[in-house]
Amino acid sequence: MLDIRLFRNEPDTVKSKIELRGDDPKVVDEILELDEQRRKLISATEEMKARRNKVSEEIALKKRNKENADDVIAEMRTLGDDIKEKDSQLNEIDNKMTGILCRIPNLISDDVPQGESDEDNVEVKKWGTPREFSFEPKAHWDIVEELKMADFDRAAKVSGARFVYLTNEGAQLERALMNYMITKHTTQHGYTEMMVPQLVNADTMYGTGQLPKFEEDLFKVEKEGLYTIPTAEVPLTNFYRNEIIQPGVLPEKFTGQSACFRSEAGSAGRDTRGLIRLHQFDKVEMVRFEQPEDSWNALEEMTTNAEAILEELGLPYRRVILCTGDIGFSASKTYDIEVWLPSYNDYKEISSCSNCTDFQARRANIRFKRDKAAKPELAHTLNGSGLAVGRTFAAIVENYQNEDGTVTIPEALVPFMGGKTQISKPVK
């Protein structure tokens, strides 16, 4: 959520930033109009309360002097009714303002390129060279079924489309990837490992920006009023919701693996085969809490943390800056890391790393103190995939496939695969 002072002091800047996302800037005028009404109501209410205090003193004085106080008692009742009415009006305006403010996205950083869609994202880095095969490479969805690593048909029978059973070495590879990523982030990148709740309440979803605007993308347990998480970013960021982080704690760096659940509303017909776009998938997440002046350097560091996984696995990738028309709701700046997938003959997103500045912290009321005597300030929050496990799985299977149908295990994963160096079709 944006600071109301930005609307008051820099309305044109806010309008231009909103327009860059392709949204209607008239909401700024709506907010300013409501804010003016709100301030007038507060002023009027404060005057009434001051008068009520004075009338209360007059009543007490008249009673002490044994004088008739009926007139001032009547005024007191009228003032009470008027104050109650003003408070009701103020509450209504506050709700209207919050309803609008909570749907306005974060302000985009000045160095984000302008554009309308992912076609306008700007490549800033490329690592590795896509492999040239001496045979016709197969898509990962064919490889995993031939090697008995996955079963899409039985998953569809049990749960519907966009689900998968990982079986045999497929399940082992998924588990190995999660363990490898978490181990690297905790032992080399300085993150604290967390196991997170995978069902969260509405306040939690509101804090990170999923609610109220993106409810259609979520799965909800209606009876309990809980939501399945679309990413571990949600519970990790909300760890400090409604808290003041004490001096000396920041920077705080969390990493955690979780299942992620997404309805994929609006993605019909896209990536319908394989592991790229499922309703349920595993992901290792990185979340950071930073002092405002440190958050931009933290974004660069976190992005290189994600890239280090791909480099050690030997998977070619590129980094792009998301343009103004493609960046997410809560982010001020986002890097996407895209891995090379031979089946697409293209790079596909495998990680998004974002600086959300104080946007989520304001929604979730996450503050910190620089020292014990300091006034609490809003922290900056960052999040990044480190990495999407299923897409890493697909990239390994496709990039490390062999002509005889086997798949070579990247050297970095061998210790996490029990020493296994290759995946072959099971004997039975």
UniProtKB/Swiss-Prot annotation:
**SUPFAM superfamilies given in the database record:** Class II aaRS and biotin synthetases (SSF55681), tRNA-binding arm (SSF46589)
Residue positions annotated to bind L-serine are: T231, A232, E233, E285, S385
* EC number(s) stated in the UniProt entry for this protein: 6.1.1.11
Q: What is known of its domains?
A: Consists of two distinct domains, a catalytic core and a N-terminal extension that is involved in tRNA binding.
A GO CC term?
cytoplasm
- Which CDD domains does its entry note? SerRS_core
Q: Which reaction does it catalyse?
A: tRNA(Ser) + L-serine + ATP = L-seryl-tRNA(Ser) + AMP + diphosphate + H(+); tRNA(Sec) + L-serine + ATP = L-seryl-tRNA(Sec) + AMP + diphosphate + H(+)
Q: Does the keyword ATP-binding apply?
A: yes
| UniProt entry keywords in alphabetical sequence | Aminoacyl-tRNA synthetase, ATP-binding, Cytoplasm, Ligase, Nucleotide-binding, Protein biosynthesis
Biological processes, Gene Ontology terms: selenocysteine biosynthetic process; seryl-tRNA aminoacylation
Cited function = Catalyzes the attachment of serine to tRNA(Ser). Is also able to aminoacylate tRNA(Sec) with serine, to form the misacylated tRNA L-seryl-tRNA(Sec), which will be further converted into selenocysteinyl-tRNA(Sec).
Superkingdom classification of source: Bacteria
Q: Where does ATP bind?
A: R262, S263, E264, E349, I350, S351, S352
List the Pfam families hit by this protein, alphabetically. Seryl_tRNA_N, tRNA-synt_2b
Chief place of localization = cytoplasm
Q: What is the lineage of its organism?
A: Bacteria, Bacillati, Bacillota, Bacilli, Bacillales
The protein's matches in HAMAP family, at most eight in alphabetical order, are given as: Ser_tRNA_synth_type1 (MF_00176)
* PANTHER family named among the record's database cross-references: SERINE--TRNA LIGASE, SERYL-TRNA SYNTHETASE
Q: Which pathway or pathways does this protein act in? A: Aminoacyl-tRNA biosynthesis; selenocysteinyl-tRNA(Sec) biosynthesis; L-seryl-tRNA(Sec) from L-serine and tRNA(Sec): step 1/1
| Assembly with partners or alone | Homodimer. The tRNA molecule binds across the dimer.
Family under the similarity heading:
Belongs to the class-II aminoacyl-tRNA synthetase family. Type-1 seryl-tRNA synthetase subfamily.
Entry's localization field: Cytoplasm
Q: What is this protein called?
A: Serine--tRNA ligase
